[in-house]
Design a protein with these regions (language model features):
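Conserved G1/Walker A P-loop phosphate-binding module
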Residues: 1-81, 90, 229
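Canonical P-loop GTPase G-domain recognition
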Residues: 5, 113, 122-184
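Conserved glycine(s) of the Walker
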Residues: 15, 155, 246
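Signal for well-folded cores of large energy- and translation-related assemblies
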Residues: 24, 28, 43, 47, ...
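Catalytic P-loop NTPase motifs of RecA-like helicase/translocase cores
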Residues: 38, 62-63, 95-96, 124-125, ...
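Conserved C-terminal guanine-recognition region of P-loop GTPase G domains, centered on the G4
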Residues: 47-52, 74-145, 216-221
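Active-site glycine-centered loops adjacent to acidic/histidine catalytic or metal-binding residues
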Residues: 57, 119, 149
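P-loop NTP-binding site
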Residues: 184-295
Length: 295
């Protein structure tokens, strides 16, 4: 059986988490239309009759402006240390940008096969597609170049088939009933954070995180208390909304997803706390599990 690790790498907001969710046919990694949604390394396990592939979804590589940004970059870079193959994902609709070039220069340092994955192919015509393929060929000798649409599941199965060619014959790495490395509390916090980002759109930047403070697993109901952390009072007011209307809406949308995940009723209580400059404070980054690659 073919098995191995595959890292999904790219600048922020090119569809890395969407691709992972498409491959696994589940909403494992949260997505939004804002750059930098993914903050932790998420492993999703794909298995079929002749392969087991561990896909590693990474934070988008970017030029950092704070301590959190530095940590996210280090997390993304670290994934190439123990993988068999790198998928370099780009947004073909946006063309070749400085962010893509920044990532590519880092990838050139790796002695690993790299498949260039051109995402959002459904949004460009064939002439632009061919033009960009030629430009990327001039930039680097990629092992393969693959156009896909992760959102529409276009050509993704063919990509999986190609990935298998680069994996060793080592048998299963994990038991068949495993599909991810993330904890339940992490999944809960990410679902809540996704709803914050989607409901508030451009009003709220990525200065938001979420922590599960209490969880009681009853037979017929899951009881969850979670805290949404922001760095400014003005952001808190947006998330809470008039008469707590926005916070109630965020909680309702999160509860729908969580009830589907747990398969039972969920009681979700949300709070919002202001911690100024939390992205620069080691104490809070450690509490949020975001400091493990700082040193």
């Amino acid at each position: 059986m073919k098995s191995g690790y595959v890292s999904i790498v790219g600048r922020p907001n090119v569809g890395k988490s969407t691709l992972l969710n498409c491959i696994l046919e589940t909403h494992l990694a949260i997505t939004s239309n804002k750059a930098g949604t993914t903050r932790n390394i998420i492993e999703g396990i794909y298995e079929d009759s002749d392969s087991q592939i561990i896909f590693v979804d990474t934070p988008g590589i970017h030029k950092p402006i704070n301590k959190l940004g530095n940590i996210l970059n280090k997390k993304a870079y670290s994934t190439s240390e123990n993988v068999d193959l790198i998928l370099f994902l780009v947004d073909i609709e946006a063309g070749i940008g400085k962010g893509d070039m920044f990532v590519l220069e880092k990838l050139k340092e790796e002695n690993l096969p790299i498949i260039l994955v051109l995402n959002k192919v459904d949004r460009v015509n064939k002439d632009k597609l061919l033009e960009l393929i030629m430009k990327y060929k001039d930039l680097y000798d990629f092992s393969e170049i693959f156009p896909i649409s992760a959102l529409k599941n276009d050509n993704v199965n063919a990509l999986i088939k190609t990935i298998k060619k680069y994996l060793p014959n080592e048998g299963k790495i994990f038991e068949s009933d495993m599909f991810t490395n993330i904890s339940t509390n992490f999944y809960i916090s990410e679902i809540i954070r996704q709803k914050v980002l989607r409901k508030t759109r451009e009003e709220v930047p990525h200065s938001v995180t979420c922590v599960v403070e209490k969880r009681i697993d009853n037979k017929d109901k899951e009881i969850i208390q979670a805290c949404i952390i922001v760095d400014r009072e003005s952001i808190k007011k947006i998330i809470v909304g008039k008469n707590a209307s926005m916070l109630k809406s965020i909680g309702m949308q999160a509860r729908i997803d969580l009830e589907e995940y747990f398969g039972k009723k969920v009681y979700l209580e949300l709070f919002v706390k202001v911690i100024e400059n939390w992205r620069e404070k080691e104490k809070y980054l450690k509490e949020l599990g975001l400091d493990d690659l700082e040193n």
